[in-house]
Amino acid sequence: MKIFPALFVFVLLFGCSKNENSPEAADLNQNETAATSAAIPQQTYLALGDSYTIGESVSQAQSFPFLLVSKLNARGKNFAAPRVIARTGWTTSDLQKAVLAANITKKYDFVSLLVGVNNQYQGLSKSSYRSQFRDLLNRAINYAGGKPKHVTVISIPDWGQTPFGKKSGRDRQRITEDIAAFNAINKAEASARGVIYTNITTISNKVSTDPALVAQDGLHYSGKMHALWVDAIITAFNKAN
């Protein structure tokens, strides 16, 4: 006879518990997930540059700005789709005109700046590159709300190492030296303003031994290379957050 009270208590405690797989439990889990996502403020990213930033010869999803946001969000961040102001063939002067035309008034949580390869390719002066790059960098800092650590300057890849560069008929040693000189300028400007510098030039030189890192046009870089760039650039984002 004493078994019945104990059995009654057992049923009362355990028989009424919800199955984790029940619709009610699923609704609770979904609500908790939604609440967690809503609790993380959405962050914004502005990418300024040229063909390397826009991801010439690869899909948008494979370009480093979009890959970067995807990877950050997979790690628990909440970034909106990046805003990209970039076009194949742009020099620093072209990018200056583009950002002025864009009339950017919004502040971004993070800004990247990668430009200069077309200055080198077109034989433009390093002095004009310095002054124009400095202006672009100052604007980038302003777009980041005046926070230098929320900006990264990304080095210029050495296109002379690509299949196109090898077949171009140009002096590849001269290309390498010129790219190094332009990178010395953008690195110095970044350092002077306390901006994070990201070197992707060394990574990009791997095209010499890995054809899979080059896009089909033989000049630009594949999605695989953009992914390697992201591994380097994400360090700058981590420092800013």
Predicted regions and their residues:
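Short active-site-adjacent helix-start/loop capping segments
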Residues: G55, T91-D94, N119-Q122
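Bacterial signal peptide processing site
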Residues: S17-E20
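Short, flexible loop segments at the rims of nucleotide/cofactor-binding pockets, characterized by
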Residues: R87-T91, I175
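Alpha-helical cap/lid subdomain in secreted, periplasmic
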Residues: K97-N241
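Serine-esterase "nucleophile elbow" of acetyl-processing enzymes
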Residues: S22-T88, A98-K106
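C-terminal motif of bacterial Sec signal peptides marking the signal peptidase cleavage site
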Residues: L12-G15
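Sec-dependent signal peptide recognition
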Residues: M1-V9
